[in-house]
Amino acid sequence: MTFNHKKMEPKWQQYWSEHNTFKTTEDKNKENFYALDMFPYPSGAGLHVGHPEGYTATDILSRMKRMQGKNVLHPIGWDAFGLPAEQYAIDTGNDPEEFTALNIANFTRQIKSLGFSYDWDREINTTDPEYYKWTQWIFEKLYENGLAYEAEIAVNWCPALGTVLANEEVIDGKSERGGFPVFRKPMRQWMLKITAYADRLLDDLDLVDWPENIKDMQRNWIGRSEGAEVTFKIKDSDETFNVFTTRPDTLFGATYTVFAPEHELIEKITTPEQKEAVEAYKKQVELKSELERTDLAKDKTGVFTGAYAINPINGEEVPIWIADYVLIQYGTGAIMAVPAHDERDFEFAQQFGLNIRPVLEGGDVTKEAFTGDGPHINSDFLNGLAKAEAITAAIDWLEKEGIGSRKITYRLRDWLFSRQRYWGEPIPVIHWEDGETTLVPEEELPLLLPKATEIKPSGTGESPLANLHDWVNVTDENGRKGRRETNTMPQWAGSSWYFLRYIDPKNSEAIADKEKLAEWLPVDVYIGGAEHAVLHLLYARFWHKFLYDIGVVPTKEPFQKLFNQGMILGENNEKMSKSRGNVVNPDEVVEKYGADTLRLYEMFMGPLEASIAWNENGLEGARKFLDRIWRLLVTEEGTLAEKVTTDANANLEKAYHHMVKTVTNHYENLRFNTGISQLMIFINEAYKQDTIPKQYVEGFVQLLSPIAPHLAEELWEILGHTETISYVAWPTYDETKLVEDEVEIVLQVNGKVKSKITVAKSLGKEELEKIAQEDNKMKENLEGKTIRKVIVVPGKLVNIVAN
């Protein structure tokens, strides 16, 4: 006998919708719990089975917390700006807004079919002007506080996409989407000064409960380095340049210097003989992406400028080279090379026959760079010193001589905040003909994205908005002409603050009401994929800290606990993708097995954080378990089974209380697979009984309800209840019922285990000795032997010594 999910699931989804069951309660007498999913980008492909894994996890927590008497905020929304919709519009001539709306409708249908307990009244959409009004407002505040500025930046320009890409969107010199060639080109861009928050972004990782590997990824991305900035003079010139080094103690081993090909001094210092070679090399570098330039495995390339610098610590002349592995945007765009003790410098020196001088004892620098530590040699006043003392002594000397100073640098760059795209938030800025730049007045926000009948690249590198002359060109009341900013914001903008808007989504006066923000923040648990470890999470933390500084939000950090679910792979352990043809559509699973089966299966596959292959057999196993519950509790006629009675059953007492305790604990700690195992153990025990107390059945159904909510609601109704199960108080357990009153005793002959028995904990030595001697296996082993001694350790063992 099986239940009909096709009838049951729509019935309860309709009930929840009509009764607004999951509307967020804001009862001042209750604690609050905020469970957040990384909101999806509504793609044309729709939901895949990877999406519901994280969503089911937050849903289980949300449903449990409601039953535990908390106000629960569990919202959903759409990260709906983005390149695919624009690409689709350019390719087909359709409107990205209409395309996005269709995709959202499809995602909504799919998500509702899975029975998630979202509060749909709080649904948000980053492309809604009432939403992006506040994204624009945050940009204006950043600008007013000196954290948004314009700069000429060498960017990743992709002519085929007609846009500039962030470094992360470029893979091996090609665009991540579409695989088109990418070139370096200087362009006017908006930047956000995330570097101003580098130390706080680093230090405040200690305030949050996040996976250590994610914290490490952020620490490495921020990349704080302590060292010294050193000034080098250029021979026969008044020019100087600075280099940053974490090892100023190795200056005596600096035998050449390298500039980034874009360094402004190259033009001035290159000798006439080297000019042609230098120009040719610079052209070659323009075609390379940052990743190609810094690839450790590639052959080193470079060219000599003909000029020399003076090493400030020993007065030596050292040649100045240019090479693509030095990037203008990192450090000062120039490095001092110590080839004896750095692998990259060593390879470069070997390739071009440059001097290699060891300044640390150890290794054989004729064969390879020595990157270990040892006492200093060939280093004048640093000779014999160990690393830490030598660094201090070198910096002290540089500061005394006025040619260097202590310095902290970061790998983190400012955030490139503009995109040459149509389908994004307009940046609320006007550039006037007299050179002034002003913000669109706050009371005029939102600055609406204009409708475009045809979206096509402008061809100039500007966004398609540049084609909309009526929108772009403006005149102020004094007749002064201006142009609106044609760049739009990146997709990261709307997702950097969306969790705040859920708290008060209809507020037209502010991002959200201050009191409400204080009640709900920080987010209690945030679940999503590890692929957002750096960018989204770093950007959201940066905006949150800025909003904290200007008094908008009450907390330093947005997300208290972060959890990354693993990836659901195809049946052959490969990533699911359209190109591989191994994507599983949840619609098909819901149709065949039901949403509860999908939810149960995804939670039972293995630990939530593990990446696991999809398996149809596992899906069938999950459905069989739900059918097994149904058969145990419900008759063919759909009424409550006769074996469910009001009578007590001592045989199930311990199993029930153990289940309540462990399942609650496992759910709290996101160990859903082991929680489900406990539900299965209880059902196995219940099948062995002639009667099952109704109270235990109700408790079981409540524990099942966060995982399989439709089936649980149906069973709850069959149990005689007229209200939803969603707010019934969570089951409790009695610790005294869990006390073990029995214990396993090991029985030994001459110290070797021969048998094991389970006995009452209270048995004394004499009783244990008697039981041991009467045990059949012990009798066999003692036959024909004389007992010399009996050792009894109550609660543990009986050892009979015999010969």
Curated annotation (Swiss-Prot):
Per UniProt, the short sequence motif 'HIGH' region occupies residue numbers 40-51
Species: Listeria monocytogenes serovar 1/2a (strain ATCC BAA-679 / EGD-e)
| GO biological process entries | leucyl-tRNA aminoacylation
Task: Give any GO molecular function from the UniProt entry.
Answer: leucine-tRNA ligase activity
Q: Where in the cell is it found?
A: Cytoplasm
Binding-site residues, ATP? K578
Q: Which intervals of this chain are the motif 'KMSKS' region? A: 575-579
What gene is this protein translated from?
leuS
Q: Which domain of life is it from?
A: Bacteria
Q: What is its main location?
A: cytoplasm
Q: Which reaction does it catalyse?
A: tRNA(Leu) + L-leucine + ATP = L-leucyl-tRNA(Leu) + AMP + diphosphate
User: PANTHER family this protein is in?
Assistant: LEUCINE--TRNA LIGASE, MITOCHONDRIAL, LEUCYL-TRNA SYNTHETASE
Instruction: Tell me where the signal peptide lies.
Output: none
Lineage of producing organism: Bacteria, Bacillati, Bacillota, Bacilli, Bacillales
Q: What is this protein called?
A: Leucine--tRNA ligase
